Design a protein with these regions (language model features):
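Hydrophobic/anchoring residues in structured secondary elements
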Residues: 37, 82, 113, 175, ...
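Tandem CBS (Bateman) regulatory domains
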Residues: 1-10, 50-87, 91, 96-104, ...
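Conserved short beta-strand edge segments in small beta-sheet-based binding/regulatory domains
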Residues: 171-174, 204-218
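Short acidic/polar active-site loop segments enriched in Thr and Asp
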Residues: 33, 109, 169
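A glycine-centered beta-loop-beta connector
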Residues: 27, 35-51, 103, 111-126, ...
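Short proline/glycine- and acidic-rich turn/helix-capping motifs at secondary-structure junctions
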Residues: 177-185, 215-218
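Basic, Lys/Arg-rich alpha-helical nucleic-acid-recognition elements, primarily the DNA-binding modules
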Residues: 1-50, 58-59
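Short basic, glycine-rich beta-strand/loop surfaces that mediate nucleic-acid
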Residues: 184-193
Length: 218
């Protein structure tokens, strides 16, 4: 799965001259937290976030309400945006996991997606979570099970074979290293057409594996 499969295409974009107040209004009205700032031909110049629009109280000093209003109306996107040279971006053909690793490493909540110096999309932590939910079958009825398996070749196959022999289908799955147990992995599966009791009986019959959690998702 690649960034281009999960990113938000055609994000709302603003110019450097856009008043910061208008940028904030756009964010509120469209329920977004990031706005790419672009120049001619959608070339990336910077990024506005909710945090960059925060004015420290110390900057307001002893100004009265009218002076504060005038000060805020004079602030432009280019005055508060994350500049291009400090911006972390990604290619649309990058893998989803590389995007996640980059966001974690750089501690950022989004990555503008750039192709040939043009903004073609934006991928955010919300996009990542939405895709994770989809990969694990979020919002779909079924039985969800977490199985701890030895980190050996063929362990996943045992589960898929045992389930398929019953005529059931695994329509979502995902795995990760077990916490503090480097020799084991936790595999999450979601199965339709089986009851929790039926699936549990099959999984408990697989030697060397342990069912950590099993529940029916209505």
């Amino acid at each position: 799965m690649l960034v281009k499969d999960c990113m938000t295409r055609h994000p709302i974009m603003i110019s450097p001259e856009t008043p910061a107040v208008k940028a904030q209004t756009l964010m509120i009205e469209n329920k977004v937290r990031h706005l790419p700032v672009v120049g001619d031909g959608k070339r990336i110049l910077g990024l506005i976030t909710r945090d960059t629009l925060m004015v420290p109280p110390s900057d307001l000093g002893s100004l009265n309400v009218w002076e504060i209003s005038r000060l805020l109306s004079d602030i432009k996107a280019e005055d508060v945006m994350v500049k291009e040279n400090a911006l972390i971006t990604i290619d649309p053909d990058a893998t989803l996991e590389s995007a996640a690793e980059l966001m974690i490493k750089e501690k950022v909540g989004c990555l503008p997606v750039i192709e040939e110096e043009v903004v073609v999309g934006i991928i955010t932590e919300v996009d990542m979570l939405a895709k994770l939910s989809e990969l694990l079958g979020g919002g779909v009825e079924g039985v969800r099970a977490t199985i701890r398996v030895p980190n050996k070749v063929g362990e996943y196959a045992k589960i898929f074979s045992a389930v398929s022999e019953k005529g059931w289908g695994i329509y979502a799955s995902g795995g990760a290293a077990a916490p503090k147990q480097p020799d084991y992995w936790d595999l999450v599966i979601k199965v339709r057409s089986a009851s929790k009791e039926e699936l549990l009986k099959v999984l408990e019959g697989i030697e060397g594996q342990e069912v950590i959690d099993i529940r029916t998702i209505p």
